[in-house]
Curated annotation (Swiss-Prot):
Gene name as annotated: mscL
Top-level taxonomy: Bacteria, Pseudomonadati, Pseudomonadota, Alphaproteobacteria, Sphingomonadales
Protein family membership: Belongs to the MscL family.
Protein name: Large-conductance mechanosensitive channel
Subcellular location: Cell inner membrane
Entry GO CC: plasma membrane
NCBIfam families documented for this protein: mscL, PRK13952.1
Membrane-crossing segments per the record: 16-36, 39-59, 89-109
Main location: membrane
Record key words, sorted: Cell inner membrane, Cell membrane, Ion channel, Ion transport, Membrane, Transmembrane, Transmembrane helix, Transport
Length: 154
């Protein structure tokens, strides 16, 4: 086999294609979650806790340099000036994103499990109907009659 044929066989296998689709869907899902978090939930949480953008929340751990003329409330400006900062706001944003993603994935898993359970019940009912509806073959009926006759003679 040539390398091209081997590569074609490798790519055409279901696992590789499924993985590729999962990566693309994961990227799209990440964009949706980022939008839900950044555009919908974080403004509400920020309004409740007094700030719309958590990423700028920080605690100054050291002194501001003597010649500093920037804003004392700007995380980026203070960081560029070399002021030691404890920037917990971005961490809070990432934690909120994680909790939202975990909850949504949990709900998707619960829904998938419920749908699978219903599908299994439907399949079991179909199999029962098929088993009930299928006539017993004549040779089986004959063998049962012979068995019953032999039991009766004992």
């Amino acid at each position: 086999m040539s390398i091209l044929t081997d590569f074609k066989n490798f790519i055409s296998k279901g696992n590789v294609l499924g993985l590729g689709i999962a990566v693309i869907m994961g990227d799209a899902f990440n964009k949706i979650i980022s939008s839900v978090t950044g555009d919908l939930l974080m403004p509400i949480i920020g309004a409740v806790f007094g700030g719309v953008d958590f990423s700028g929340f920080f605690i100054r751990l050291g002194a501001v340099p003597a010649g500093y003329t920037g804003s004392l409330t700007s995380y980026n400006d203070l960081k560029k000036a070399g002021v030691p900062l404890f920037g917990y706001g971005q961490f809070l944003t990432v934690v909120v994103n994680f909790v939202i993603v975990a909850f949504i994935l949990f709900m998707i898993m619960k829904l998938a499990a419920k749908l699978q359970k219903e599908l299994d019940k439907t399949e079991a009912k179909k199999e029962e109907k098929i088993a009930e509806a299928a006539p017993t073959p004549e040779d089986i009926v004959l063998l049962r009659e012979i068995r019953d006759e032999l039991r009766g003679k004992k």
